[in-house]
Amino acid sequence: MNKLRSVLPGILLFAVFTVFTALMCYVDVQPVGMASTGLGFATLNTDVNRALGSNETIYKITEILGYLTWCVVALFGLLGLYQLIRRKSLLKVDRDIIVLGIGYAVMLAFYVLFDKFPLNYRPPYPWNEGELEASYPSSHTLMLVFVMATAVMQISHRITKKTLRLLLSIACIAIAAVVTAGRLLAGVHWFTDIIGGILLAAALAALYYGIAWGKKDRTENTAAE
């Protein structure tokens, strides 16, 4: 029961993402995408896209910030490798690091899945040469939100200095927020692409927290009481 309670928020968020994704396939689907491809919630998406327009500068900024995702992934990968070499056993590597590696793999699996079987394609924007690119969910949003959310969790558990912990956490949250908003403002994703990316990332992050620390945190809270 305790294990289920730990992962329940993540399961519920994933259920919301699944329902939202299903609705994308049936609600207000119109051939308004690039090359007249279908798009769910078409009226909402096209209204938002027309209102915001496109901005190549913002797009380039989000692309640059997107590389930070892989820097963070590499950092925790190196931490896991260091522990493995130092402790000479995979079983002795911190549980939260092992689960984080699995989380990264699951995140990439979802990226590949939606790239190979796209639900819709990106909206037309001036610097696109007509190439059809999978758009749902926004991969930048998915990766930045998940990686930065789990980074904040790692920071809160590994860094003892409050000021440094706060500054690093704010930086992670700010980067994720800027990229998420930037992908929409740049005009390279539909509104529902962003929502889908946030929902999936939040579900994976909640599942990660529940598996890596949920039971431990509840035990500590009970002991404190």
For each feature predicted by the language model, list its residue ranges:
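Membrane-interface loops
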Residues: 32-34, 84-166
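Hydrophobic, lipid-facing residues on alpha-helical transmembrane segments of integral membrane proteins
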Residues: 8-19, 98-113, 117, 146, ...
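Hydrophobic, aromatic-rich alpha-helical transmembrane segments
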Residues: 3-7, 60, 64, 89, ...
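Membrane-interfacial, low-structure loops and terminal tails that flank and connect transmembrane helices
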Residues: 1, 86-95, 219-225
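Long, hydrophobic/aromatic-enriched structural stretches that serve as scaffold segments
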Residues: 76-86
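N-terminal transmembrane-helix/juxtamembrane module of multi-pass inner/ER membrane proteins
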Residues: 1-73, 116-128
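Lipid-exposed faces of alpha-helical membrane segments in multi-pass integral membrane proteins
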Residues: 16, 68, 72-78, 102, ...
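Membrane-embedded catalytic cores of phosphoryl/pyrophosphoryl-handling enzymes
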Residues: 4-10, 24-25, 127-225
